[in-house]
Amino acid sequence: MRIFSGDNKVVDSLASNPGLMSPSNFGGDFGSRLKVNVTSKKKLNDSSPTSPMESSPVSPELVPILTLLNAHTHRRYHEGVFLILQDLNNNGTHAARKWKDVYGVLLGTQLALWDAKELAEFTDPSCPVSEKKLKEVASKPTYINLTDATLRTLDNSDNIVMECGKNLTNALVVSTTLKNRYFLQFGNKESFNAWNSAIRLCLYECSSLQEAYTGAFISSRGAKLGDIRILLTNRKYDYKDWVSVRFGAGMPWKRCYAVISQSSSKKKGHFGEINLYENDKKVKKNHAMATIVEAKALYAVYPSSPKLIDSSTIIKVVGSVKFEKKESAQEKDVFIMPEKHQAVPSYDTIIRFLIPAMDTFKLYGRPEKLLSSKNDPHSLLFGLPVLPHIYYLEVEDLLPLTNSVSSLHWSNNEWKEHISDILQRKIAQGYCGCNSTSNITSPLPSPFLGSADLFERADGVLSPKLSYGSKSSSNNSSKNSLPKRERVKLSSSSEQDLNNSDSPSIKRKSPPLVISESPHKVHTPTDASFRTRVTEGSPYAKQRHPKPFASSVNDSPSDRAKSRTVPYNNNDRKATTPEKFERGETSCGKNVDESLEKVRNMKLEIPESNFDKFMTDKNLLSVDSKCSNEKKLSVESDLSAIYEKYSNGPFGHTEGLNGSSDETYLRFQRASVHSESNYNSRKSFTPSDFSNGNEEEHAVLQELNSLTQRINELGMESINSNSDSDRINGSYSQVDFGNNNDEDDMNLFDPDFMAQDQLRAEERDYNKDDRTPLAKVPAAFQSTGLGITPDDDIERQYITEHRSRHEVPKRSPEKPSNPLEIGNPYAKPGTRLNTTHTHSKTDRSITPQRGQPVPSGQQISSYVQPANINSPNKMYGANNSAMGSPRNPKTRAPPGPYNQGWNNRPSPSNIYQRPHPSDTQPQAYHLPGNPYSTGNRPNMQAQYHPQQVPMPILQQPNRPYQPYAMNTHMGSPGGYAGAAPPFQPANVNYNTRPQQPWPTPNSPSAHYRPPPNLNQPQNGSAGYYRPPAPQLQNSQARPQKKDGFSQFMPSATTKNPYAQ
């Protein structure tokens, strides 16, 4: 079967296909792609570098994990030349299917690719045009993201042949996002094993670090949940909520309803399942859109930036999915994103999904207990490196697996199990990680890949050579600060040693990974000007010009280009150890930079390359080891002389980014204070830290404590501030679980909370000058000011605030009372605009005691008109002493019982009468900032002007009346002994008819507002029945005034028009 066909025309499939386009954070000019994550705006102080934790928003519990994640992002796993062919586009259609010779660098899970043919076309450094073209080509690599990729190896059983008639061997099939699929073919078995091991290791470390991040995330954020004890208990409950799901990376998100069902059996092989429905109406299993029946891994996805940790809710499930009930399960990567809820933190949402999901598939020790041991392969923290170690394994550790014939048929899960077996055996011998370094420039470097990662050697997470030319770097006397580059002239003895050297590694054709002398040969430091590296023993390092180093500084770059494999000194090279390279020293004890200056301009050879005859010879598509040796082509790419010109601005690292140089190189200066001894001096948790004298109380939190203890053993004490360290080393007994009475614990889900709070605050500010308390309320009963008033507070304020009728608070003319609320016994004290007259027991109308006359100068007033009213009737004046208003302190009511209401009906004592629901109406709703606004009440006229008094209710046509004082507690004289009953709104029909200005002298008082005779039609509608009230007996006639408000009061001489 042939899958590769087409004409001989070269098609740039990598550049033309959108699936291989560079991500948005890559590309651009060569120098502008270097992104430095400056987390502080402070000026750099060499004597006291700023701690990363002082400017980083990340909690200290997550810093060790984020350090390892970013170290993995910038790790250079492997590099070399191979052939690539894109088989399918992102939509599943056939691509160009043309082989292309590329030079690739695997950085983390990003595979950067350059067209090897284009790189070889511009080998003349003396030509300015070539330099410009080479810069453009080198600055725009193509990236393939392998984070969620699926790998499969091809062998003879696949029966895939090329156009030359030979089987496709030493090839990998890579399926990435959407439906993109690529074929990667390597020159020989050794190269294939090296690349296969590197890609498998990078995927294993990526998933393992994501699981460790999940453990650290639950440990640091889970303690903030108030019911974390209940959530971690071993109890089975179903989880139901709306989520967004996508099946595979790059697929569209679909909103569905997720139901996590727990297993009813405790056996090992019985799991629950996650059912996904299109809606929350039909949640039966036969209506499920998809069902996750098994999960091998489940973890929270790190959002690539520390600032997004608390807002990201993406979860990845690696398992088996059924889309139909009768079909077999398919292995899929499912991404689930629980929907966020208002006023609920994102970490709360994701943790409440993670724990039940782990329980249903019995992952990581759940539902019994989260495993925190780094020796247990089922733990979230299995094999986690201990800082300063930053990697799980070396690529060479996986070579025995790739050399095995059986590994050709392993699935991704089987590869993970075999890699875990290797790591477990090493951990049993005291293994703590690899690639130790004390030159970690920052625990939180930039997640972006730039020119420093692509073309420059990084001893640690990022190369310290980025600080060349920085004043702060040159002035720092720390051993990690490298001096400025200077041209080094070799002595004659050194030249003789190099001429006489005959390194056996030059003749070696195997890749550098199989050499057991140094596990770090892939990462041998090179000069900043020559960033594409070839190591000792590499097939790419065949010596073309065994000419000794040039001794003159005036030699041209082409004369100074030498072979990379020639040692610095053949006698001292044998004593060089990886540890000395890690410490920044060579075998002779000198700085690496001094030795690297001798070999900074070397030629890069690309062996087994075929791009010179790419368009003529089809057979060159086959790179079988037998035929490829006969047609092997070696093309030199003298990149070193070109890149040397870009080591300075604007494309090099001596020119800072926008802003001060101190900000640009801040994270590199921090490396001077992070020594290896500081990393090992971290204090970890002990069981006594969490006991606090009560072990049973914190038994459930032991899972989080164990995770925190393991994470804090990573040794990052030097990057934490004192306050953060104290907080980490404290016990969980001091963790706030949401029981404090602070603002964060308020019930934000109360729909009336915000409205009440705003109303109270606005009305208090509005009436702070008008409300003079008549009786001081004790501090214990003062209002909380948060929109919530205790019951006792309401009662005492209602009684004491209006106890006396003889004192009236001073009222400012520009802020008068609200007439609509006068006489409303259900208005809450905290929400009324005016508290001068309310229907408390002191505000009831007072009648003389039976048998006793009323003094001639005393009048009973029930309504106080605001001052400055343009009215000819002087009896409504604010200071009219003849009225006997409450402003006259000498006016007193005669002793005796109070009148029991507007109709003076006798009523049995101690009987509470609740008004009919339709007898009341809602209070006037005031929007903040406008005390006279009508709010959202329909068809309601605006509030009265402060200097306008409404007409009596009875004279307002077809207007509903407000509640009156008939439903008083008859056991106490005049009204309620405590708080008023709750307000009950009713359906009220408002009108907008014009109102008459003021009551006529024959109209009844507006104070009493009795209901009309409901037995008679009122504007076309019949009202309620009102029983007649008994008349007063033995009451003496009061002196009749010719005018005044008292003429409308019932007496012996004046009949009450509403008594019948």
Swiss-Prot record:
The residue ranges flagged as biased composition, category Basic and acidic residues, are 571-589, 801-814
Gene Ontology molecular function terms on file? protein kinase activity
Q: Where is the composition biased (Low complexity)?
A: 465-481
Q: Key word Transcription present in the record? A: yes
Q: Which GO terms describe its cellular component?
A: cellular bud neck; cytoplasm; nucleus
The membrane spanning regions, by residue number, are: none
Q: Where is this gene product found?
A: Cytoplasm; Nucleus; Bud neck
Alphabetized PROSITE patterns for the sequence: PH_DOMAIN
* Positions of region (Disordered): 465-589, 801-942, 955-1060
Where are stretches of biased composition, namely Polar residues? 490-504, 845-883, 900-923, 931-942, 1048-1060
Give the sites modified to Phosphoserine: S491, S510, S518, S538, S556, S871, S885
InterPro entries in UniProt:
PH-like_dom_sf, PH_domain
Q: What else is known?
A: Present with 1380 molecules/cell in log phase SD medium.
What the protein does comes down to: Acts as a component of the CCR4-NOT core complex, which in the nucleus seems to be a general transcription factor, and in the cytoplasm the major mRNA deadenylase involved in mRNA turnover. The NOT protein subcomplex negatively regulates the basal and activated transcription of many genes. Preferentially affects TC-type TATA element-dependent transcription. Could directly or indirectly inhibit component(s) of the general transcription machinery.
Q: State the family named in the UniProt similarity comment for this chain.
A: Belongs to the CAF120 family.
Name-wise, this protein is CCR4-NOT transcriptional complex subunit CAF120
Which species expresses this protein natively?
Saccharomyces cerevisiae (strain ATCC 204508 / S288c) (Baker's yeast)
